[in-house]
Amino acid sequence: MSRQGAEPKPAWSAVPREIKDEVARVLRSPVSRAERVYGGYAPSATFRLRLTNGRRAFFKASYPAPKGSGVKWVVDVEDRNYRRLASLIAPWAPRFFGSFARLGWHVLLLEDLGPRTMPPWSPAKARRATRSYAEFHKSTLGRALPRGLSRTQHHDFAGFWGELAKTGEIERVASLAHRGKDEAREWIDVVLPVMRQLEDALAKTKPPFALLHFDTRSDNSRLQGGLLRIFDWPFASVGPAEFDVAAYAQGVTAEGGPEPERVLAWYEEVLSLRADAIDASLAGITGYFADRSWKPEIPGLPRVRSFQRRQLKSSLAWAARRFDLPEPRWLAAVAD
């Protein structure tokens, strides 16, 4: 069993018998082996299942969270999205075998996409994954999409820099550099007007829009040949493809992969990007990580803040290059 992470995930032995029996009923076969899966950032119950009939499946579930947990389950939304978006998210999403809710558990049964494939991010892997991601967006760009999906979810990223300046919490961002906080604050003072102007444009981005996954990272995707398989769909929405790819690109870099500029170039081998929409998206994304990186750890989610600080560093370094800003040398002092 491969364990990566510190989230307190339940063992298969902790899954109630009634839940296991219903899994067998939905999948038409009892489970012969359940391998607990780590790798994501939430403590959801996740298992790769081998069935007695030789088939495989993936089990994902929310369950009654322990007292004091900061986890907010969204498995019910993900369930709904797998059902209503099935024709739009294939072949990228795993096949959906069924779901049920009982005893405080909400279970999704999906195609098993196998073990983690990234990181490491080689240039060849990153290019194949990125081109497939572009094909996903291209498949729905400009199409009529379900009305129940948000068209404004990306707007939530349009005001973080402004709010940090207004509340004075921008000092908390600079303090991430510890002894270099004065240098960090000077840099932030220089770039803040640029970031605020660009992030304001995010809510004004015009169509054409596409179906967005809105949370594409290596821990919720697998690369199978030239196809990027993407799971975890609770945040699916409609918006500019540029937002999805900007968030994805800096995440690749944060995990030791190629620089975002290369990722965007590979994406544009399949689908053109609008420079102004990338600019607005990148400003909004950097603001989000600036707002989150200094905050306390979330109970039950022990690795989230660390990964957000890594993404703050990769996204701000990219923004400095893209917007012709001074080099943020202070980022070297920011601990993961």
Regions found by a protein language model. Name each.
Residues G70, A210-L211, L223-A265:
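Active-site Asp-x-Gly
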Residues L103-R116:
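Conserved short submotifs of the Hanks-type protein kinase catalytic core
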Residues E242-S272, G284-F323:
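Active-site activation/catalytic loop segments of kinase-like enzymes and analogous catalytic loops
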Residues M1-E35:
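Juxta-kinase regulatory segment immediately upstream of eukaryotic protein kinase catalytic domains
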Residues R116-H155:
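Conserved kinase catalytic-core helix
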Residues L27-T52:
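ATP-binding glycine-rich phosphate-binding loop
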Residues A11, V15, S150-A201, D324:
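Active-site catalytic-loop/activation-segment of kinase and kinase-like phosphoryl-transfer enzymes
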Residues A57-S99, P120-E135:
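A conserved alpha-helical element in kinase catalytic cores
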